[in-house]
């Protein structure tokens, strides 16, 4: 598997092609913004109809990353579900699939703005996780260091094509959204530009993760 290795606060990390973050020394795999159940929520709220396959596609990619890394610890970095009702409304196949992935693992759900509070589906539920020298939370805090977050679904454009990306500088890493149908925020948006140092990189996801200077 091609990865992009980098260091944050002295911790050796790697971005996987899928957008997952792998911390081999801790056996920790981190994914952000799965947004499971998005098509169901859209249908429930009489919004645009989306093909009802995004949960299966997301879980299939997550299963592949778990198998590739053998991760004993999984951190879901918030907005794992599109809303609380989506967590309760997974169909039996998806619920069973998720249960198989969680079995025998230290599974940690970080609260997001779409899914605050305990979800009642097992695992550990936290507002943030401190695993020195890193802190994992859903939304970046200005001035924080050694921080891994998500929320913004960052994307960057290269050769006319926009792709999900990891944003990283000496203080923080902002993960791309892992889920299907998640959209994204351009890296030159003021919300992201204000968080990242001027020498930040955008690492484009894909079969061969590719670092470029963060577009501003």
Regions found by a protein language model. Give the residues of each.
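Extended recognition/assembly regions associated with phosphoester-bond processing machinery
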Residues: 1-76, 80-216
């Amino acid at each position: 598997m091609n990865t992009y290795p980098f260091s944050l606060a002295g911790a050796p990390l790697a971005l996987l092609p899928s957008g997952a973050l792998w911390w081999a020394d801790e056996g920790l795999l981190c994914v952000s913004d799965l947004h499971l159940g998005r098509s169901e929520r859209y249908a429930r709220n009489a919004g645009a109809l989306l093909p009802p396959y995004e949960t299966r596609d997301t879980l299939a990619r997550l299963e592949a990353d778990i198998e590739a890394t053998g991760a004993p610890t999984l951190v879901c970095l918030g907005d794992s579900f599109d809303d609380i009702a989506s967590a309760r409304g997974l169909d039996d196949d998806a619920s069973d699939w998720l249960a198989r992935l969680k079995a025998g693992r230290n599974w940690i759900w970080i609260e997001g703005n779409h899914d605050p509070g305990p979800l009642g589906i097992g695992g550990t539920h936290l507002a943030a996780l401190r695993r020195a020298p890193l802190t994992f939370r859903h939304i970046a805090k200005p001035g924080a260091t050694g921080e891994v977050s998500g929320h913004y679904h960052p994307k960057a454009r290269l050769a006319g094509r926009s792709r999900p990306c990891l944003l990283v500088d000496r203080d923080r890493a902002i993960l791309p959204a892992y889920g299907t149908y998640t959209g994204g925020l351009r890296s030159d948006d003021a919300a992201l530009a204000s968080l990242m140092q001027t020498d930040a990189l955008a690492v484009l996801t894909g079969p061969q993760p590719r670092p470029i200077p963060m577009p501003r």
